[in-house]
Amino acid sequence: MRTVTGPTDRVIVVGAGLGGLACALHLAAAGRQVTVVEREPVPGGRAGRLAVEGYEFDTGPTVLTMPDLIAEPLAAVGEKLSDWLELTPLDPAYRAYYPDGSTLDVRTDTTRMAAEIARVCGAREADGYLRFVDFTRRLWHLERDHFIGRNLDTPVDLLNLNLLRLLGMGAFRRLQPKIGEYFRDPRTQRIFSFQAMYAGLAPHDALAIYAVIAYLDSVAGVYFPKGGMHAVPKALAGAAEKHGVTFRYDTTVERVTTAHGRATGVVTADGEHIPADVVVLNPDLPVAYRDLLPPRRSPRRLRFSPSCVVLHIGSRQPYSRIAHHNIHFGTAWKGTFDEVIRRGLLMSDPSLLVTNPTHTDASAAPDGRQTYYVLAPTPNLEAGPIDWRGGMDQRYADELLRVLERRGYVGFRDGVEVQRIITPADWADAGMAAGTPFAAAHTFGQTGPFRPSNLHPSLPNVVFTGSGTQPGVGVPMVLISGKLAAARITEVS
């Protein structure tokens, strides 16, 4: 494994996102002097918080899996997860709604889930589910330590016995045919493959190794932190500060300074130079290269994941039939992926994620009120020539609200008291390449050692963390990326 050369005592981490915070904790545990520089007044990055008229909204991820990956950087400095976060297991993890009117509750207890699938789809599907759980559990255990949890510099790093085991399991086949080995009912096929969208691919294009996302979501368990997802970066930052990490909030980094082929620190917007032995960059990787680092002669062309429109809704209207997380599938399943990913079009028959945080935590809204987070996948700004300015955002939001009312949210529009719309243009303004919060797609050529490295190719003391580098997209992967970035600094080649 390649590591940072030269002194590593003073480290600047640019950005207090989940990856940057995890990295800072691991570095503090290794005795480094760490300063985190963050442009916002609070930590969190994409896992931010929006307060509007008594309503509180998570502005980034809403699904939390694998809390042991939060516990890991805390444990590195001797802290317990339970002292910093109160987590509620969600049961069901999701409630799925299908065009035929049927529903399926996703339970993380395999016995109860098998019974639910048997009730809705029949005994054969339940048997397939149990075999699928066994497959994905083995997949996760093989991938976590030997592929996801390691710094991979070249394809040679993949060559070990576990690669042969993965090949034997069919992990490098396409996801959709692999799902078809276990499930025949389109409803179960959808609930265990829709996660491919967040890896940037349609299920028939994604590799079967990404079935681990379904494992994390629907088998390992989904949790909700008291205070919302923003409570996670608050906890990590609090623990880091307790253990000597310095935080500089409301401070924008303009560029990384270099001399003699090495980074020497960063310059802030007010002209201050902060010296460092190592610089860790948590902003979206392509944007960090574009805005903070010396220009490269031939920047790599990346393929980006789809984006999304998110509606943050504060409402008078409750719906007793829904769960915390709700997935509403449209009729046109394969066609939806084709529209969003290949053709750069908005979904003609939307599939939507509706999260109702006040279902679990009433403190997110005024008394008797509800918060809703509505996510609709859309093309990113490179794939779809959609002008989100000039009223397009409101027109599309209105269309999504009409779709929700047709799908059972009766009177939804009348109950809205607060509405905030986030579009791909807003994601781009927030510093996300191609206007997507899901970073580079997980194509074969952008996975593992082929994904952009977390070590700069010519500045040996610049390291990256976050979803744009290894191992990839999603809260669990970003937390692991922080550990991998720290290992580049603290370990010996």
What are these regions (language model features)?
Residues D185-A199, G344-T355, V410-P471:
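A glycine-rich dinucleotide-binding beta-alpha-beta segment and adjacent secondary-structure elements
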Residues E254-P366:
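Mid-domain catalytic core of redox enzymes
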Residues T258, E491-S493:
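Active-site-proximal substrate-binding core of FAD-dependent oxidoreductases
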Residues T5-H141:
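N-terminal glycine-rich phosphate/pyrophosphate-binding loop and immediately adjacent elements
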Residues V212-V267:
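Helical element adjacent to the flavin cofactor pocket in flavoenzyme catalytic cores
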